[in-house]
C-alpha cells in the first residue's frame, strides 16, 4: 500500500481580532524579532564594555529607519504589484502591516539610523554592528514565521515530503483565494510548494550559531563580525532565491534579489579582508557622556600627580643636602608644590560637584584644541612653572642680585650659560635668605600669583604630554 506524503500544513489564518482591533501574525513576528535582537545586542554590547541600555537608545533611530528602508526596497523591487496595470495602489503600498519588507533596504537604512544614534551616544558604529549582528539574524529567522502565516514567499511546486500546503482562504468578501491575508482557510489545498521560508529560517539560525562561535573563538571587531553576518546571509539567500517561484522583478531572467545577494556578498568579503584586525578597547564603548564623567572622576588624582611631577622635573632635586638647593629653599618649594596640588584637587572636586548638580562656582574649562594650538616653541618657553623662577633666584649668588635681575628682564642681552651657584656658607645667615616676590625691584609684588587655575592646568598637561 502506497503511503501519501505528509506535507506541512499552512496556518488556517494570519489575523485575529480583539474586538475591532486586528492582531496580525506577521506584525507579532516582526515585533518579537526586534525585541529579541535588542535584548541580545544590549547584553553583548555591555559584555564588550558598553553602557547597559545604550542599545535601546540607538534603536529609537535604527528601528524606524529600518522599517522604512525595508518597505521602500519592497516597493522598488515589486512596484508592479502596487503601481502597475491593475495594481493595488498607493494606499496598499503604505499598509506595511500587510507584509512586504525587503531585508536589504531594512539593513541599509537601519545602519544609517544606527549611525545617527551612535553619534549621539558617542560610540563607534562598528562596535554596535558587531554587538547586534547575531541578534539581527535571529530576528530575521523569527520574522520568517510571519511569511508562513501569510502564505507568502513560497517556492516552486514540489512532491517532497516536507512540501508546504497552501490552502484556499475565504476573504471577507466571500471569495476563495490562496493569498488572502484576512481570510480563513477552507481546508482545500490549492497546491504544495517548497517551504522556502523554512529553509531561510533554518539557515538564519545556523548563521546565528556561527556568529556566536566566531566571536568567542576569535578576536573580532571593527565591524568584521557584522561583515560575516552579511556574507553568510547573502550566500544562503542566493540559494533560496533559486527555489522561489512567486512573482518578482527579473533582470535577464534572474530575480533581482539574486543580483543583490551577489553584489552585497562581494562587498562584505572585501570589508572583512580590509577592516582592521583585533577588537576595540572597552574604553571606546563607554560613550561620550560616560567618558566625560569618568575623566572628571579621575581628574583630581591625575592633576595632583601631574602637578607634583611637573614641579619635580622643573625644579630638580629638592632633598636636603643638595649642593644647589639649600634646605630653606627646598622646604619653600615643597610647600608651594603642596599648596598648588591642594588647589588643583579642590578645583577638580568643584567640577565633579557641578556635574552632580550641586551649586558651585563655575570653573574655566580648557579644551584640547587650546592645548594643540600651542607651538613647540611656546611649550619650551612655558614649560618651567612659576616656582622655578623662585628656585633659580634663590640658588643664585646673593652678592649679584642686581646683575641677575637685569639679565632676567633685559631682552636685548644675549643668553649666557648658567653658572653653578656657590654653596652657601651656613655661618653667614644672609646667604641663606630666600628671595621673595617683592625682592626684585623690576618684578612687582605678586606678579607670580596672577596665573589662574586654568593656565596652571594647561601648563601641567603640556608638560605631561611632552614627557609621554
From Swiss-Prot:
GO biological processes: lipoprotein biosynthetic process
Organism this protein belongs to: Mycobacterium tuberculosis (strain ATCC 25177 / H37Ra)
Its job: Catalyzes the transfer of the diacylglyceryl group from phosphatidylglycerol to the sulfhydryl group of the N-terminal cysteine of a prolipoprotein, the first step in the formation of mature lipoproteins.
UniProt keyword Transferase present: yes
Primary location class: membrane
GO molecular function, one term: phosphatidylglycerol-prolipoprotein diacylglyceryl transferase activity
Transmembrane segments: 21-41, 56-76, 96-116, 192-212, 218-238, 256-276
Residues binding a 1,2-diacyl-sn-glycero-3-phospho-(1'-sn-glycerol): 144
Region Disordered: start-end pairs: 349-468
Basic residues composition bias: residue spans: 456-468
Subcellular location: Cell membrane
Enzyme Commission designation: 2.5.1.145
Residue stretches of biased makeup (Low complexity): 391-406
Tagged with keyword Transmembrane: yes
GO cellular component, one term: plasma membrane
Record PANTHER family: PHOSPHATIDYLGLYCEROL--PROLIPOPROTEIN DIACYLGLYCERYL TRANSFERASE, PROLIPOPROTEIN DIACYLGLYCERYL TRANSFERASE
Source taxonomy: Bacteria, Bacillati, Actinomycetota, Actinomycetes, Mycobacteriales
Protein family: Belongs to the Lgt family.
Protein name: Phosphatidylglycerol--prolipoprotein diacylglyceryl transferase
Topology of this chain in the membrane: Multi-pass membrane protein
The protein's annotated pathway: Protein modification; lipoprotein biosynthesis (diacylglyceryl transfer)
Top-level division of the source organism's lineage: Bacteria
Comp. bias intervals (Basic and acidic residues): 445-455
Gene name in the database record: lgt
Keywords annotated in UniProt: Cell membrane, Membrane, Transferase, Transmembrane, Transmembrane helix
